């Protein structure tokens, strides 16, 4: 099996701010479709799940050069402002599940 050059699979954890859980779930629904509409993410299936503490974990794949282009894309920057109001991005290692050999999360339906 060979990796596809230039594409990057990422796992990111979003810890909702108090009272912002619903906003974060809505952002999770919008996130990758918006990135795809801007040609920044691939069609690789998205996985979204939730940790016991309410943190949302998302797995998606950036298109080649997508990460760099996202940082200057006004549509993405506006979305990231909404994320900043709704959550904090935290290291995966901060989730209690991450200390288990088989980290288990509750799947989210997007």
Regions found by a protein language model. Give the residues of each.
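Short amphipathic alpha-helical/adjacent loop interface patches that line ligand
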Residues: 28, 32
């Amino acid at each position: 099996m060979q990796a596809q050059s230039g594409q990057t699979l990422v796992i990111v954890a979003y810890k909702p701010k108090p009272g912002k859980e619903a906003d974060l779930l809505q952002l999770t629904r919008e996130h990758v479709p918006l990135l795809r509409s801007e040609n920044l993410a691939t069609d690789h299936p998205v996985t979204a799940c939730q940790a016991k503490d309410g943190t949302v974990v998302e797995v998606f794949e950036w298109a080649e050069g997508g990460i760099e282009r996202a940082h200057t894309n006004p549509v993405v920057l506006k979305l990231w402002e909404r994320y900043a109001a709704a959550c904090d991005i935290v290291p995966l290692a901060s989730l209690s599940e991450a200390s288990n050999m088989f980290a288990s999360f509750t799947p989210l339906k997007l």
